[in-house]
């Protein structure tokens, strides 16, 4: 079944279902843990999870019947909303939720303050009798919980109470180990169209037939939840103030396909203009842009959401590793709660960052960017794109507004004087939805407290003591340990500042990452990819078949003549100079003119052979046997890495240019599949906000192009919109994607009609149920689907003409560090006890005393000569690394060390002197915290008369064994690509930059650029850690917050290339036999590798497999196993195996006193032409670097070096075969760890 065929992705079927189920207490607790609930509402907003809220084989996309015609039905494609609504008999679920006070009243106050529209139920309509409906499907109403899932196209009908349940088509399905009855819901348009002039039937919130009035599913509580959770939030994103008008427009848009008509502009209010000093022309430009992007986003939300999607892996609840690994129900609840604690880092970023997508919905005109209009007083499109930006809208929430006729309307709310961020601001951005506000408060009660040092924790303590009076505004003293007032007291120092002046900032969004990426130090520069000719590489099938979606993704110069500013992508968002965009004649190789991947692969292979890293996981496996061993291993490693860097410099000089290196682009992709975040309704809410932000930002390009050519000449903005919107819509639909940022895909159907047996809707409206064969037509043969957005970063700063360069990247002096703080410090800490047994001093103090020449004589350091050589080596390596360190990031594992050293040396040898930027992934971890800072552990509202009594009670909790509360912190990943390889949920600041094409092209392109988090309360690891005014690392480093979902919510795919245990042993044995360690017999190392994971002596067939079929070698190993068996050896450690099996060799070596036969003449080159190039086979470990074919002088281990004059011919001979190893993924493996 083709994944690209629309009829396969979206089968014919209903787009809404009712589920009737009997929930046990365990299932209710699971739902309460994963859902959004509030004590004031009977509606629970649950995630859309297969195996929990819907059946395991639930299809997320359907072609649903919408209209009838003679002999058949017309179907439209839609996908289900990523949430489910439980609304009947939910007391058992709500009882498990935390009480956060009177959240309902908080939301009402926020509506009054900000003049938001409130939901009003239909006064003359009787709600559906749910007890009768339960009885109709054979269920007991008092024991049955009812919930609904609905498609995006039908949610307005659900709000209006017009969906018709067909109980005759009820089926039994299984949900979380129990049975449930599923009943389909059909839209009223199928039953209204009974006249010959079917188009005369009105589609409206208020107009309905008698049949729909009597049979429609109308639950006011469900309608109210949709009103606030979905529509009020959408209105905020679109700067639209009338949710009911938006619902009406969405209803008609889905049925009548009115995406190309103006729907919202006549009712739009223009907010946030009064605080800006704008000329008449600037105000017109801003109003028109506001209206156009609002209308386009509303129209294309229907286009993109009413499309066909694949279910995401993270929505398969029954297959979550977190679920399958749970031993019992309590263990499952603990794991789910810990997952939510991990997510608290992302929720905190959304709340505490002033540039969060929750707040970035105001459109402003930044005059400083647009005070240079062209002749005649008009503005160019590029000027408008620089001037019109999205900013934080909290400060303008209470301003007067303009209407469609550009008249000022007075603000109808009740603004307060105090503009500090408070609970009502949170209620505002939550759309005044109580369940959503309550969900945020749960997280605020569990994030870490950041004390300022002025009042410490006394503010929270004093608040809890004051709660004994029962005067809490939030809860009246009933639940002060968990109410929203206490939550805001806890995080008061982390709350965002409401900005007074608008400014351009990136927008913080939270979505799931995609696997493919180019985020290593130089990104896509020098990357090559094996692709099939039919795929066309990055412009063909990349990340899940997305054009331009491959890991190269790049940026820089476009070889096809597309646009370039040195950072953005070329045409199709593919790659430019650094990623190449080229494919060989055979269609097999795509990528750059040079092959950096080949060099990294060689380094990786070397590390494997020398047993420095695990060949599968990339974890460090180096074990220091002593100081001399340490020096020997890392001297050889450093030399090998430096030689590879020199070889790559030669290759780049021959085949590339400095501009290509300077244009290196890092890129990663963010998933826009709505079901990637369906496991948490709060994230689904943030997803919709993010999609609207993306669409409107891209829509600005189309809007400004028409505004420049068609000025506003009428009094009504909507009239101008009516004249031009159809053309604007068509232009946006053809140019919105494939411009470097937003990527969509057309899902097509090969046929527009089919035949099947469906309900006879006309007979059913007359009271007769019958299933008849009929023709089924599809309204559209193709639908666009959201795929992803691409975010880029350019690590190498390039100053403009006449610019001396940014002070943030300037590298004026090289700091000197002691070895424990240098590039090998992580190894010194790890092996301190082994290098200096019985030392008595911790690692850092030991090296401080060594570097200060103050080490006491009674500290045992071993042989003085060996110690001196060891210290000299470390000092030299540390100084050499610092001299070439352009990253300014200390390595923390062997992989990061060799990768950093390679790139540092390459860049320095190539002439780069300043610091470069870097990407860092901060992954969430859980740590224990102080009981006193987490009042929710009290279990009841506090009743303390003094801070001392509170402190005594907290001490009693610890004594009683109450577990310490957990909170999420973050740790920097050694390799940022591991964030994407583990399918992480990421929170990242993104700015959408627009730029014109080259060669005077009128095309405007865009790219997403990673930015910064605004505010000091987002996460302590993001704050400026140094008080020094010269430390600008925070300006060079870009961060993303991540929570790994692989092995937690996403089961790792086990494809054909899965490695079994025997394969892993074989790999390690072969590496041991190929190792060049002269201190140990390779066969003993192979024996150790086999026995390290086995408890018994292996069979001869197994050994033959491990040595790749070499019978002589297998026989020799079997002799050693037999010797172990005869002597009864049970200790299979490497030291003991060497003592037992390698004793004779050790005695011979010791007896020789270190003297060896001089066999160097046997390996001398026979002629001048036999010199080995660095790029081909690499230098022998004993060769002098000064004699390499690239003509570099590399004095000693510290490796300086400079180019010789006229070295071109020499270089031509020094790169032999360097590009022959292209292909493969090529990057060093990321370290694995669990959530």
Swiss-Prot record:
Subcellular location, record wording: Host nucleus
Region listing for Disordered, in residue ranges: 536-584, 1214-1235
GO BP annotation list: DNA replication
Ranges for region Required for nuclear localization: 1232-1235
Keyword field: DNA replication, DNA-binding, Host nucleus
Biased composition, class Gly residues, residue ranges: 545-584, 1214-1226
Protein name: Major DNA-binding protein
Organism: Human cytomegalovirus (strain Merlin) (HHV-5)
Encoding gene per record: DBP
